[in-house]
């Protein structure tokens, strides 16, 4: 449903992307600074460089913690094992593979800074129109925002209240990071919103896969008892 809504919005009103990005842009020749607003602040550049490293560190840390909780002496802390495992898997498969390796490398959408409206040479492409104007690391979807959205993974296998809480944390982190990228001219609004949807769908798939494997394992463990009875 969310995919349909976003698709309709950005298909019917594709210029919404340009309008939002224009809030953060000042053309050359006007008084004061020109370009995208966030580029005027060194702290934003630091955050931009730090987010990918945070994602890589989180995926590695999640994997190490998942192994630790399994191998340490004593009973397994299943809650933290599941949280660590889901965080690592969603960061690698969702952000790393689906977002960065598949979509960003093949969709070809130019970034705001690359289109004529904002001083570039390219032509604006609506979100759901694959293009050939970008060869690699393209605009659709936002990898930085995806890293923030991936925080929802921590609650994927928890109780409903836990899932909602971590979903809110993931939304907050993803939207905040995405807003900075829009203000830098690195992404359009649709890149950020579709990034969140892609990560949510990947998370839902991981949750469904885990629950399916757990249910199948439980059935196998009960099978000998049912045959004996």
Where are the language model's segments positioned?
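Membrane interface segments of multi-pass transport proteins and intramembrane proteases
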Residues: 26-36, 62-79, 112, 211-223
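Alpha-helical transmembrane segments of integral membrane proteins
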Residues: 19, 49-57, 83-86, 164-172, ...
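Structural signal for the C-terminal ends of transmembrane alpha-helices
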Residues: 12-13, 64-76, 155-162, 205-210
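N-terminal transmembrane-helix/juxtamembrane module of multi-pass inner/ER membrane proteins
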Residues: 1-63, 104-111, 123
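Membrane-embedded catalytic cores of phosphoryl/pyrophosphoryl-handling enzymes
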Residues: 124-229
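Aromatic-anchored segments of alpha-helical transmembrane domains
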Residues: 6-11, 92-97, 172-182
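Interfacial segments of alpha-helical transmembrane regions
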Residues: 65-106, 167
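Membrane-interface interhelical connector segments
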Residues: 106-133
């Amino acid at each position: 449903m969310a995919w349909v809504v976003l698709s309709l919005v950005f298909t019917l009103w594709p210029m919404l992307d340009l309008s939002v990005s224009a809030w953060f842009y000042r053309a050359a020749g006007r008084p004061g600074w020109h370009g995208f607003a966030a580029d005027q602040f060194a702290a934003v550049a630091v955050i931009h460089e730090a987010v990918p490293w945070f994602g890589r560190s989180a995926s590695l840390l999640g994997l190490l913690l998942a192994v630790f909780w399994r191998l340490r002496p004593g009973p397994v802390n299943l809650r933290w094992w599941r949280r660590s495992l889901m965080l690592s898997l969603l960061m690698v498969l969702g952000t790393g593979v689906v977002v960065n390796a598949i979509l960003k490398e093949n969709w070809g959408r130019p970034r705001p800074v690359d289109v004529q409206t904002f001083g570039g040479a390219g032509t604006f492409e609506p979100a759901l129109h694959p293009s050939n104007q970008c060869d690699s690391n393209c605009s659709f979807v936002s990898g930085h925002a995806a890293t923030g959205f991936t925080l929802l993974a921590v609650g994927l296998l928890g109780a409903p209240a836990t899932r909602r809480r971590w979903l809110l944390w993931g939304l907050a982190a993803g939207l905040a990071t995405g807003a900075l990228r829009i203000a830098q001219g690195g992404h359009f609004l649709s890149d950020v919103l579709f990034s969140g949807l892609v990560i949510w769908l990947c998370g839902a798939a991981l949750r469904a896969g885990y629950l399916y494997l757990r249910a199948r394992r439980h059935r196998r463990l009960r099978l000998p008892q049912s045959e004996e009875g």
